Design a protein with these regions (language model features):
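A membrane-interface helix-boundary motif in multi-pass transporters
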Residues: 113-114, 175-193, 380-404
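Central cavity-lining transmembrane alpha-helices of secondary-active solute carriers
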Residues: 59-74, 276-289, 369
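Helix-to-loop junctions at the C-terminal end of transmembrane segments
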Residues: 68-81, 177, 284-298, 382
Length: 429
């Protein structure tokens, strides 16, 4: 097939809902990552929460964001993608706006009625509901609004836009906070404006994709039943728990790294802007690393990615400088690229025959579990090594140790369980 023919297939292979849904996903990711880039700083420096409380709140928020898509896909199927997206964007608009209005006079009553920690946590649970619905809607639209011959390209476009949003979100936060001088609270308000505009885009331009043979509605009760079916698979659950160690290491980027940089390296550092380095590195090197690792077995690639990301924080332990922070994020991203694409391939092979779709729905659970642990762990390590031991850079040895322990457990797991023929660390396929 010629390049011109392939280009023609791409031009005609996607229906309008595909482009609208992915366009809105880009701005939703800008809002999410912009918020995430400044959230720890906002809680610690502006609300004066302790490091441990900051970590606990962020861990809870991240867990809800990444766990709820289990049910979010069910709701999207039942109510339709259009209504679900509109609901999600409105919910996020309200949540981000409330977060940016904590110091407003009209919030005085809520601040008096609740302690700050419970008020903030309650408000954060509102925008946390949004991604749980947006993710399955956009992924489902990509499947239904693209022809079979270009569907893989559709998913590549989807993941690329997610990473572009991950790059632009922290940049947006920095622009609002620094050059415009509007402060952190207005970062949340800009995030609210961003997702509200996507509500309007969905309202006026998105139409329900209705390709036959692709739509399967599952009840909430059935989704919960399926969850228990999956969780009874000991081998699968054990793998998810072990691989959660990657995300315990990874989420320190948003939990403890910004506080470490501003608290112990440079109090004026633009931590939010620097957090764009991870996603930008992914965009730049994804194709190259995919090519280099194409012959490495899926499990070996995942284990290697975990090891690389774990070692990344040792750079900051040995060189606690802004340059060390940047280098650590680049290496962290390289590890993320190495494992991410092969992870879903491996999960599909772990699933029993005929249950690949069901198991893939739970592939993101390590992300949620990792965030839930990463938050409190990062907060504790910051307080202990920073305020008690007065050697804050030593915390990164512990973070790296968690990842290295996870790497060793992955090797042990691979020696005990061989999911499918030739899926061990030392075999091809």
């Amino acid at each position: 097939m010629s390049f011109g023919q392939r280009l023609a297939e791409i031009r005609t292979g996607f229906d309008r809902p595909f482009w609208v849904a992915n366009f809105t996903e880009l701005f939703e990711r800008v809002a999410y990552y912009g918020t995430s880039a400044v959230l720890a700083i906002f809680l610690s420096e502006q609300l004066h929460f302790s490091k441990e409380l900051t970590g606990w709140i962020m861990g809870t928020f991240g867990f809800v964001v990444w766990f709820l898509p289990v049910l979010g896909g069910t709701l999207a199927d039942r109510f339709g993608f259009r209504r679900s997206l509109m609901f999600a964007y409105l919910v996020m608009t309200v949540g981000y706006f409330l977060l940016g209005s904590l110091s407003a006079p009209w919030m005085e009553g809520a601040r008096r009625a609740l302690t700050d920690r419970w008020l903030v946590l309650g408000i954060l649970m509102v925008p946390a509901l949004g991604p749980a619905v947006v993710k399955p809607c956009v992924a489902g639209t990509t499947a239904r609004a693209s022809r079979e011959n270009v569907r893989s390209i559709g998913y590549s476009i989807y993941y690329t836009l997610v990473n572009i949003g991950g790059t632009l979100g922290p940049v947006m936060a920095w622009l609002v906070r620094k050059p415009l001088g509007l402060g952190i609270e207005n970062v949340f308000r800009v995030a609210a404006l961003s997702v509200f505009l996507m509500f309007l885009v969905t309202l006026f331009f998105f139409r329900e994709p209705n390709h036959p043979g692709e739509h399967q509605v599952t009840s909430v009760a059935a989704a919960l039943k399926n969850m228990f079916v999956v969780l009874r698979n000991f081998r699968f659950v054990l793998f998810l728990l072990i691989f959660s160690s990657f995300y315990i290491v990874f989420w320190q980027e948003f939990v403890s790294a910004p506080l470490f940089l501003r608290g112990y390296v440079d109090p004026n550092a633009n931590a939010d802007l620097l957090l764009s380095i991870d996603a930008f590195t992914v965009i730049c090197f994804q194709i190259l690393i995919a090519y280099v690792t194409r012959r490495i077995p899926a499990f070996a690639a995942m284990t290697l990615g975990l090891l690389i990301s774990s070692l990344s924080w040792l750079i900051l332990a040995l060189h606690p400088t802004t340059a060390g922070f940047i280098a650590a994020l680049v290496v962290l991203a390289l590890g993320e690229i190495t494992q991410s694409a092969r992870y879903y391939e491996y999960v599909s092979r772990l699933a029993p025959p005929g249950q690949q779709g069901l198991y893939m729905g739970y592939a993101f659970l390590p992300i949620a579990i990792g965030y839930f642990i990463a938050g409190p762990l990062g907060g504790y390590l910051l307080r202990y090594f920073g305020d008690v031991v007065h050697q804050p850079q030593r915390m990164w040895w512990v973070v790296s140790g968690v990842g290295i322990a996870g790497t060793l457990l992955m090797v042990a797991y691979d020696r005990v369980f061989k999911p499918g023929q030739g899926q061990g660390l030392g075999t091809g396929g």
